[in-house]
Amino acid sequence: MELHIKNLCKSFDGSPVLENVSFTAGPGVTCVMAPSGAGKTTLLRILLGLERPDSGNFTGNVRWAAVFQEDRLLEHLDAMGNLRFVLGAALDETAAGALLTELGLGDTAGKPVREFSGGMKRRLALARALLAPSAALALDEPFTGLDEENRARCQALLRRAGEEKPVLLVTHDPADAQALDAAVVKL
């Protein structure tokens, strides 16, 4: 499955944020790179249907799973409770337990998310996206707050996910693209 983005434009209050953005993303990891404030998050919001472009189009009507800059977790639930609440009947609890363990969250049963560190919350948000039944992943700065070891774990999981579906990741860090062996789109 391929996503085709063609001539996307978006302005806010007359100031252009995206100007004629075009690229194709197939299975694998594609990193959209630009400095802070250059429209990376806006691009993801358009693809996710949360914003409307001023002009241009994209094809690939897909079900997305996303990691936003804010983790959007339920603070009073534990890790598995967050996954159950969001994914419902689609959740494979055996796979979820294995993924939580792989992400270093296997020993958090019963611990409310409000007691998690920022990096733990980030890994849980990534687990939620990876477990969701989706055709593509949209990830907004998914490695923020992760130490080197956990960053490498998450990168390995995203490379693996990219073998089956498009993984669109926005970042300003070229090291992310290199570690993910990603195609790069510069805004």
Please report, for each region that a protein language model flagged, where it lies by residue:
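Catalytic Walker B motif of ABC-type/P-loop ATPase nucleotide-binding domains
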Residues: L137-E141
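Conserved ABC ATPase signature
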Residues: P112-F116
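Conserved ABC ATPase "signature" region
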Residues: L91-T108
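Hydrophobic anchor residue at the start of the ABC signature
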Residues: L126
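Helix-to-loop junction immediately C-terminal to a conserved catalytic motif
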Residues: L48
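Q-loop/switch helix immediately C-terminal to the Walker
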Residues: L77-A89
